[in-house]
Amino acid sequence: MSLAHQVLAVNNDLPIRTDKPVHSGKVRSVYWLTAEDSARLIKEKGYNVAADAPLAIMVISDRLSAFDCIWHAEGDVRGVPGKGAALNAISNHWFELFRQNGLADSHILDIPHPFIWIVQKAKPVMIEAICRQYITGSMWRAYSKGERNFCGINLEDGLQKDQKLSELLITPSTKGILKGVPGVPEVDDVNITRADIENNFAAFQFKQKSDIDQYEKLLKEGFNLISGALEELDQIFVDTKFEFGYVTDASGNDKLIYMDEVGTPDSSRIWDGENYRNGKIIEKSKEGFRQTLLSHFPDPDILLNKDRMPERQALAQDNALPIDVFMDLSSTYLDIAEKITGQKIVLSENPKQEIIDILARDFDVII
């Protein structure tokens, strides 16, 4: 089977029984199960949720998203081999560590296949919850231009690129475009301050103002737990993005939980510890691919300037990247996943058929 067929690039066309439109994200697709199938599975599987809780099947793909665009390689390769399985394996590992250490729950109820999560519907908080332990990326770009206030946080003079910060910083941005929020521009992923959130907590979908403290607590707890585990592997947890939402438990209580993936090479920067101590940055995340793109094209401003999005989308659509770029990134994903989980990531020959077979046999949701 060709490489193009081994990757799961299209994941929104599975014959899963649903009475709602399939939600297709940059990497994952979400199939909302019917009320009947949700209730049946909750009873059959013993999921610890309300009897009438809506369930969904979340299917990850191997697609490669960067700078808000989907990229492809020569030979019509439209995904990175092993990427989806690696991301899910890492998230599953961290969520299990969270559970063992008494942290908040996630929306994941079951993991029947490396590409599949059975999830409970959650109401998302409209914040990209970003934590930073080092000054790099967009924070460094702003700082190097003379900005000393970032997301409402005052930064001292004299900081150097990639140095460790004196404390863990929370630098949130909006999740999508929020309209009608005083002081918050109506653009995607715009930086915000804690004061913005406090003054408009309902607009960000917090149920109560005190939940802001809870989200920051969960953010720091999750970051510190992953950072400590990576430190034991001589890997540096540089920064990351968490997402949060509310679910209703079996007793009818609303609770704030972790959503989506955590601590992955897609949502985080991870550096090799030994090389960092020797003054060299070796990326163990998608950040390496982003840097490759910035050097690959003659005008990197297209990738960084949100006002040039049509040009950026055309760039991604019209340019097949060298296959070596995708294979190098595949090695990065698989290597860090195997290092974190301690287990080899087994690649599927035909992931789509495997998914269909399991969902038919064990869940009876294939039409």
From Swiss-Prot:
Reaction equation(s) it catalyzes: 5-amino-1-(5-phospho-D-ribosyl)imidazole-4-carboxylate + L-aspartate + ATP = (2S)-2-[5-amino-1-(5-phospho-beta-D-ribosyl)imidazole-4-carboxamido]succinate + ADP + phosphate + 2 H(+)
Keywords, alphabetical: ATP-binding, Ligase, Nucleotide-binding, Purine biosynthesis
Gene Ontology molecular function: ATP binding; phosphoribosylaminoimidazolesuccinocarboxamide synthase activity
Gene Ontology, cellular component aspect: cytoplasm
The protein's annotated pathway: Purine metabolism; IMP biosynthesis via de novo pathway; 5-amino-1-(5-phospho-D-ribosyl)imidazole-4-carboxamide from 5-amino-1-(5-phospho-D-ribosyl)imidazole-4-carboxylate: step 1/2
One GO BP: 'de novo' IMP biosynthetic process
Pfam families: SAICAR_synt (PF01259)
Gene: purC
Entry EC number(s): 6.3.2.6
HAMAP family linked to this entry: SAICAR_synth (MF_00137)
Family: Belongs to the SAICAR synthetase family.
The protein's name: Phosphoribosylaminoimidazole-succinocarboxamide synthase
Disulfide bonds: none
